[in-house]
Amino acid sequence: MEGRMQDRDIAIPQLPARSMERAAAFYRGLGFDFEVVSPNGDYAIAELGSLEVHFFLHQSLVPEQSSFGCYFRVGDVAQLYAAFSRANLPGAGIPRITALENKPWGMCEFAIIDEDGSLVRIGQEL
């Protein structure tokens, strides 16, 4: 994961993972590069194009009770929705993917809930 953006200030979300192996499989299935970067295996970085998310080990997390989440604002939400849809996530339960919709707050967006219950919204301005 060389060449990370270091020429500007950015905020990077951190999400919990009960298992780095399962998180890696899930996010790789969406097209992310995923690398465990800590020697003891409790921290990882996933990247997809300019999107970056970090993961910390949280083995006692209950996915149905998780309040973790993040929002990615992207330039082409329809393209990313099509790519994520190829992972064949269900429309209900954990994990899942929601429909791509125009929202009253001026965004076209969808969401995924990952295997650890984190809500990841992805949107583009209308």
Which residues does each predicted region cover?
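Vicinal oxygen chelate
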Residues: 20, 70-119
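Conserved acetyl-CoA-binding loop of GNAT-fold acetyltransferases
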Residues: 28-35, 88-90
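Short glycine-enriched loop/turn motifs at secondary-structure junctions
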Residues: 6-9, 62-67, 104
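N-terminal beta-strand motif that seeds the catalytic metal site of vicinal oxygen chelate
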Residues: 1-21, 70, 125-126
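Conserved short beta-strand elements that form part of the metal-binding/catalytic scaffold
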Residues: 34-68, 119-124
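Conserved active-site alpha-helix within GNAT-family acetyltransferase domains
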Residues: 21-30, 110
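Acetyl-CoA-dependent GNAT
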Residues: 58, 97, 101, 124-126
